[in-house]
Amino acid sequence: MTESVGGNKLVDFLVNVQSILNAASVKCHVVDESFPAKFFEKNPDKIYESYCKFIKNRSNSEGLIRNEDKLVLTTINKRFENGEYEPIQGGFYKLYHDIKLVCTILIHFYPQGTRNYQLVDKFYKFSSELLLRECCRIGIALTQTNNIKSRSGKLLSGNEMDEYDDDDATELDKIISYDFIKISMNYTVPISQTYQIRTKDMDLFSSIISKSNLDKRPHELPNTNFKINNVLPQTDIENEAPRLGFVGANTSNIPDPTLPPTEMMTRFLHPNWYALPTTVWLKYGNYNSWAPSFNENGTVVDSTTRGLIWLERIGYMDLYEKNEKKVKQEELLNTNEEGINRKQNDENNKNVDGKSNGVQDDGGDNDNDATIASANSESTENKEQFIIKLQNLYNWTPSNYIGDDEIENFRNGTPDKLVSDSLLKLKRLRKERILNKVLKPTTEERELYFKVKRILKEVILAKKVSKVPINNVRAFPVLQTNYNGSIPVVRAQPGRKRKHKK
């Protein structure tokens, strides 16, 4: 941009500003966002409140805009093309007004801290500072040209005053200076803020909160125990702070040789002088499976209390009903067994009576046949038992044994119940073994262990489990670096007593 401020140069200025804003809003699309064309607020501090009233007056009770088709919308690029940002028409403030309006709308649309939220906030800061610089540059150029013209006129008239009066300012100069004052009075850099939480040992602070100055929403605290602190800027940057080097004596620059040395921490370097890692939010890394998936700090009832309430209200009732069913089933089984035993005893008594009345010779022949048949069956069973494949014996492991209860539970679709019962039983056996001070697990414990392992393996293979993303809680600030210790204190050396000669 050249330093002349003629009509053609102002047009070039608008074209250049439009190209810069288009390049800056490639990712956030601020210059292409639509907004009401008829809305305009002269006071830059009341743009947000006036826009809320403007929308509320045109909305119904449900919050929907009445006659939305008739609402005329425009964009910043369209206004650039229509020439509505001419400096002679107060274009600097109009452009700042539209940029602030669109950025405010987008800031309240995106959640706090997101990438788009930060991009819109950066665009607002960049464009506001760009307009302030250009206002100042063009205003200075106008002042210089008008000053030259006024000097030449005053020299011709015989007045040799070199001062630049307000009467010499043109209408364009006044409009630009007025727009500059309005923008500079409204645009402010927000104070940085951080989260603070007080723990048992020390206070922990988070990184700087990325909240925009345009955001009128309340702070979304990650926890009710957190507080917000303002990070005040350092004003005395030019004055170097004194370091903990030497502590000079108060009486003289030359220390007294009889006193102990006043040198303290000569080689001390403060940790803040290094680029050390600061407090960051919790990142679990390889321990994601152990990380909590939800935060119970803001809840009235935690998971332990909910479990106790469930156990008292529902769990004990379920156990009571199950125990009643078991007792009834055992009673039915006992009654059935007693009836069967009575029938068998009656039949045996009848058979004994019939055999005693029969012929004894037939009984002798039958006994011989029975002994022969039993001997043959025993020989075949022994042959079948001794036929074992060595390959199967070599590949056999304790986990290969499958019980009938496992097959039945898989058929009924209740393997989780069998796993729970087995784990409870395993826990009880382990507790008894530890109380008896027995280190080696029993055979029953080993069988239960392999049983649970086998069932879980079958369930995982059947379900084809894949990795599922888990959202872990990160609302816990962690202090990465902590420096313990204290400043060493100079100890006074005891003076030696001089021996006086008698």
From Swiss-Prot:
Q: List residues of the Bromo domain.
A: 19-134
| Renumbered residue ranges of the record's region Disordered | 336-378
Q: List the InterPro entries.
A: Bromodomain, Bromodomain-like_sf, Engrailed_Homeobox_TFs
Principal location: nucleus
Report the locations given in the UniProt record: Nucleus
Q: Which GO terms describe its cellular component?
A: chromatin; nucleus; RSC-type complex
Query: What's the domain of life for this entry?
Result: Eukaryota
Instruction: Report the record's Gene Ontology biological process terms.
Output: chromatin remodeling; nucleosome disassembly; regulation of transcription by RNA polymerase II; transcription elongation by RNA polymerase II
- Supply the alphabetized keyword list: Bromodomain, Chromatin regulator, Nucleus, Transcription, Transcription regulation
Feature: compositional bias, Basic and acidic residues: 339-353
Q: Which Pfam families match?
A: Bromodomain
Q: What does this protein do, in the record's words?
A: Component of the chromatin structure-remodeling complex (RSC), which is involved in transcription regulation and nucleosome positioning. RSC is responsible for the transfer of a histone octamer from a nucleosome core particle to naked DNA. The reaction requires ATP and involves an activated RSC-nucleosome intermediate. Remodeling reaction also involves DNA translocation, DNA twist and conformational change.
| Assembly mode | Component of the two forms of the RSC complex composed of at least either RSC1 or RSC2, and ARP7, ARP9, LDB7, NPL6, RSC3, RSC30, RSC4, RSC58, RSC6, RSC8, RSC9, SFH1, STH1, HTL1 and probably RTT102. The complexes interact with histone and histone variant components of centromeric chromatin.
Q: Which PANTHER family match?
A: HOMEOBOX PROTEIN ENGRAILED (PTHR24341), HOMEOBOX PROTEIN INVECTED (PTHR24341:SF6)
Other comment: Present with 4460 molecules/cell in log phase SD medium.
Q: What is the name of this protein?
A: Chromatin structure-remodeling complex protein RSC58
Taxonomy of the source species = Eukaryota, Fungi, Dikarya, Ascomycota, Saccharomycotina
> Which gene is annotated as encoding this protein in its UniProt record?
RSC58
